[in-house]
Amino acid sequence: RDPEMSRGLGDVYKRQGKGQLIFKGFANIGAGAKLSIDKDASLIFDNQFWSTGPLLIIARKQIQFGRNCVLSWNISVMDHDAHDIYHGGVLTNTPQPVLFDNHCWIGFNSTILKGSIIPENSVIAANSVITKADFEKNSVIAGVPGMTIKNGVNWS
């Protein structure tokens, strides 16, 4: 770990209510991190979570990280669209959980949006935007929007 980039947790904002911030083991959250948990949301970190530098996580429903997830700098994770959109008086863009399976590596400047599932042992390339959940484990995912560019990978 780089002591210059990993100094500790930044800002944590939790709205009044039953919102939960859960750590299931060791987590290293780098300097400049901002975590926001809505009143009925949950943000869960399993054991061996690592991030460096600026990180933005905003949970309105559920964001969950599996074991041994590694996030580079300038990562954004949101389980919603930031503003409600109505059509005919009906909310059309409800929050959707974001799930990271075990052993995921997220490259710098990446954005992970609502409804995304990052599969086990996967790599998200730098500058990617992930918007869906239909990726296979052991994949490299890259681009805007994110697409599988390689299968059968492993990383350490």
Give the positions of each predicted feature.
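Single conserved hydrophobic/aromatic residue that forms the stacking wall/gate
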Residues: 2-13
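Contiguous, function-dense segments enriched for cysteine-driven chemistry
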Residues: 3-4, 25-27, 31-34, 38-39, ...
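Extended beta-solenoid/beta-helix repeat architectures
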Residues: 29-32, 37-40, 48-51, 59, ...
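Right-handed parallel beta-helix
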Residues: 39-42, 46, 51-54, 59-66, ...
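Glycine-rich hexapeptide-repeat left-handed beta-helix
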Residues: 65-67, 73-156
